[in-house]
């Protein structure tokens, strides 16, 4: 029988498994593909294929991530699973794998553990909009009262981190039973996918967000004016629309008088396009790489913020020594480096290479266009020593 082709007609959603080590994230990922393969919605992917995840580089950081894809009757999913705890932290902080929703896997035998908490916190900070819980390994728990207790603990934890704990679906099952083809195991996987289909909202497409383009290059065309080039990050820009140039200096307003792509004139540029935008009345020296072109009022420049950061270990090419308060590296946002000073929390004397999920405050020497959820790298002497996400703007 010919293999059914994935239809791209269904809405696409990016999802990932999160949770404590050994609670069954990878087994669950394998179980989902195995159960959905029976109805032609996936290619069954074995545990060891997912566990041997290839390494990828994202903003100078090596991350192991496994990608599988599958579909339900309503949606097409791209699913990420990371073998190691540090890979999760790096993945979520760098945004290497953007998640529209997550499946939190908790072992019914152990209940929520340290990494369960860390992953929920990170999901909140990087803006994962919704999650569904899979209470795994229920086949090894005989006492229904214990299951209830674990469920209550999970809801308490979700509540602490600002998720709507009493709305979040919690599905009980066993990934191993599903992999073994047992009916109760498969039933739980189908229930889980129904919950994911119905509870995790449709993602807002990049083209529906306000227009934003990081400026990569600026040049002047004699007789026509100044052109800025870059890849449109979100939204749509049409000829004749007003835009703002934000970051590094005073924000200025200007008008887009032309959009070009591959030397052809367009009426508009949209998310994902590499374009040149002609700006009315703007001088070449008034714009520079590192600023952004944006819909007026949609993004502001800031120079003080709080961040959640992953600091590379020595083995990953990071620093060999810890850093302390007032450390001054470069912060790389989108297309440019800006020097900034790090202020550590009062209870922290230093940050060691390899520390994951570290929180501190940053003060930049120049303001950069940013918002909560903006990603950055920390660089020193041209090499990446960390990656972070803005969790709160302070000014």
UniProtKB/Swiss-Prot annotation:
Residues 60-64 are annotated as: G2. Monomer. Residues 19-26 are annotated as: G1. Its main location: cytoplasm. GO terms for cellular component: cytoplasm. Keywords: Cytoplasm, Elongation factor, GTP-binding, Hydrolase, Magnesium, Metal-binding, Nucleotide-binding, Protein biosynthesis. GTP binds at residues 19-26, 81-85, 136-139. Residues 81-84 are annotated as: G3. The keyword Nucleus does not apply. This is Elongation factor Tu. Residues 136-139 are annotated as: G4. The keyword Nucleotidyltransferase does not apply. It comes from the Bacteria. Mg(2+) binds at residue 26. GTP hydrolase that promotes the GTP-dependent binding of aminoacyl-tRNA to the A-site of ribosomes during protein biosynthesis. It comes from Rickettsia akari (strain Hartford).
């Amino acid at each position: 029988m010919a293999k059914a082709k994935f239809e791209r007609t269904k809405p696409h959603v990016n999802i990932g498994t999160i949770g404590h080590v050994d609670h069954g994230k990878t087994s669950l990922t394998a179980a989902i593909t195995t159960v959905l393969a029976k109805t032609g919605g996936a290619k069954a992917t074995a545990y060891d294929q997912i566990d041997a995840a290839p390494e990828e580089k994202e903003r100078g950081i090596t991350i192991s991530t496994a990608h599988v894809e599958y579909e339900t009757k309503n949606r097409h999913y791209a699913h990420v699973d990371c073998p190691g705890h540090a890979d999760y932290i790096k993945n979520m902080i760098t945004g290497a794998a953007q998640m529209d929703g997550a499946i939190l896997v908790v072992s019914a035998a152990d209940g929520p553990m340290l990494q369960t908490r860390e992953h929920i916190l990170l999901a909140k900070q990087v803006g994962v909009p919704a999650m569904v819980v899979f209470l795994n390994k229920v086949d090894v728990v005989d006492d229904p009262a214990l299951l209830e207790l674990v469920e209550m603990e999970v809801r308490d934890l979700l509540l602490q981190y600002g998720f709507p704990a009493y709305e979040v679906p919690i599905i009980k099952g066993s990934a191993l039973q599903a992999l073994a083809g047992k009916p109760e195991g498969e039933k739980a996987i189908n229930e889980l996918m129904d919950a994911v289909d119905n509870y995790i909202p449709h993602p807002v497409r990049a083209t529906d967000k306000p227009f934003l383009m990081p400026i990569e290059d600026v040049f002047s065309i004699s007789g026509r004016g100044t052109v800025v080039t870059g890849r449109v990050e979100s939204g749509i820009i049409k000829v004749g629309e007003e835009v703002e140039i934000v970051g590094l200096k005073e924000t200025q307003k200007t008008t887009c008088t032309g959009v070009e792509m591959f030397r052809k004139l367009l009426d508009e540029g949209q998310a994902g396009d590499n374009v040149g935008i002609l700006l009315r009345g703007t001088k070449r020296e008034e714009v520079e790489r590192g600023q952004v072109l944006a819909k007026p009022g949609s993004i502001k420049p800031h120079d003080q913020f709080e961040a959640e950061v992953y600091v590379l270990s020595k083995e990953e090419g990071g620093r060999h020594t810890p850093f302390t308060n007032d450390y001054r590296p470069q912060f790389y946002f989108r297309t440019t480096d800006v020097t900034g000073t790090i202020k550590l929390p009062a209870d922290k004397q230093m940050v060691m290479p390899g520390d994951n999920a570290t929180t501190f405050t940053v003060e930049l020497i120049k303001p950069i266009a940013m918002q909560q959820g903006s990603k950055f790298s920390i660089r020193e002497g041209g090499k990446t020593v960390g990656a972070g996400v803005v969790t709160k703007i302070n000014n």
